[in-house]
């Protein structure tokens, strides 16, 4: 008995390891893309937002300049386009049930799958939240968006200056 493991078992082990490595690679690429999209959107919203402006106001003021910047960013980075089936504003009910928040608003994109939240807490501090999604896709098998996991981040706080 020269071989402890036969050729077919060794091939099965190698294929299994290859599949696991590819899944980890796909997961890390999806997470990186969603993380970069979330941070890019957050930077744009923070640069256009001001104290007391809800998410819809930020996205529509100046002829939609913030929305145009965000859509350009997402288009350039290859973020997943989901025209007509957005998961938008999923976190809205959770945020509205938070007792430390007085006011919560949400704006969702119609072209890309992300949401922008604006919140005012009980101490009259204003901040924005961004929710993007990490996707796992199998385009060779015609399966898009097999799994999607939300990634959420808050902006820095805008304080009321009197």
What are these language model-derived features?
Residues 1-17:
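Glycine-centered recognition micro-motifs in short, flexible terminal segments and loops
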Residues 10, 20, 116:
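Residue-level detector of functional hotspots within protein domains
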Residues 15, 22, 118-120:
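Generic detector of short alpha-helix boundary/capping microenvironments
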Residues 18-47:
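Aliphatic-rich helix starts adjacent to a transmembrane/signal segment
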Residues 39, 43, 47-162:
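Short, conserved structural patches
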């Amino acid at each position: 008995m020269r071989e402890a493991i036969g050729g077919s078992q060794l091939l099965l082990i190698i294929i299994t390891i290859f599949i696991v490595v590819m899944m980890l690679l796909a997961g890390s690429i999806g997470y990186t893309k969603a993380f970069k999209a979330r941070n890019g959107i957050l930077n744009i919203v923070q640069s256009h937002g001001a104290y007391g402006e809800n998410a819809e106001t930020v996205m529509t003021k100046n002829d939609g300049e913030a929305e145009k910047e965000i859509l350009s960013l997402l288009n350039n980075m290859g973020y997943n386009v989901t025209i007509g089936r957005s998961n938008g504003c999923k976190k809205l009910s959770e945020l509205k049930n938070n007792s430390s928040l007085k006011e919560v608003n949400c704006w969702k994109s119609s072209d890309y799958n992300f949401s922008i939240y604006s919140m005012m807490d009980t101490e009259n501090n204003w901040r924005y939240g961004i929710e993007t999604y990490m996707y796992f896709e199998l385009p060779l098998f015609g399966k898009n968006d097999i799994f999607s996991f939300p990634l959420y981040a808050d902006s820095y706080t805008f304080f009321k200056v009197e």
